[in-house]
Amino acid sequence: MSDWVNKLFVERSDLFLKLMDQRWPRTEELVNGMMKVLRDNGVYSGSLLDLCCGNGRISIFMAKKGFKATGVDISKAFLEDARRKAEEHDVSSTVTFLEGDVRNLKEVVGSPSQLFDVVSNIWTSIGFSSYEDDLKAFKQARELSKKSAILFIAETMHTEYLSIKFTPTSYSEFDNIVMLENRKYDPITSQANTSWIFYSKHGKNLEFTDKVEIQHHIYSLSELTSLLRKAGWETVATYGNLATLQPMSPLTSLNIVARAR
């Protein structure tokens, strides 16, 4: 596990949980879009394997659509919050959350009672370590899935976007936190280096909380579809917004729909 991954998702999970919670209000629309794609591909029900599930928003909303969901994440704190939210949404009986590294996916999941119908990887949850590690994770996901399974990679950053709309500095506010982002991007290596600096708000004053240095490989569409093909997945569609099924462009996020080969 990369040092920054451990710090952001394990040691300072309290900060990233607040950031993840900001995405919950848009999750139902995202899952509605996923369901339309699934129906168009002949999948109406079944089981979901949610990779890097965070605090469970995709697993929980898919469970509300009737799917049996299994979420995997390395962060104990994220999974504890996910289990609480599953109870709040009354789907705890059909959602399972497992702690572990997706690079060791088969070991974490074990031998499921049945292979999965759907696999999801949402919100730029790839490129954290190496190409080989991402390939390994998606290969294992394929081995755990049915021949007709559908894979979603959604809300993901890509090189085409950064080549046109790279922003070196920005900030965001959530709860009582202000987060400053300083970014550097190398188009030759597709490596993004970002400083996330967190401040807590005290009236009109800001107090430094922590800093995380993130090193992250950004995929192009062609690079990622090639990786998926090697892992046993064939890309069948791309979108700029999976909730609205807007076509992908260099100015949208990357959303891939792939079918098991």
Where are these regions (language model features)?
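Conserved class I S-adenosyl-L-methionine
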Residues: 1-52
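Conserved SAM/SAH-binding loop
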Residues: 55
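Class I SAM-dependent methyltransferase SAM/SAH-binding core
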Residues: 60-105
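A short acidic, Gly/Pro-enriched loop at the edge of an enzyme's catalytic core
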Residues: 108-119
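A short glycine-rich, Lys/Arg-flanked "PGG" loop and its adjoining helix->strand segment in the class I
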Residues: 135-147
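SAM-dependent methyltransferase
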Residues: 152-225
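C-terminal lobe and adjacent flexible extensions of AdoMet/dcAdoMet transferase-like proteins
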Residues: 221-261
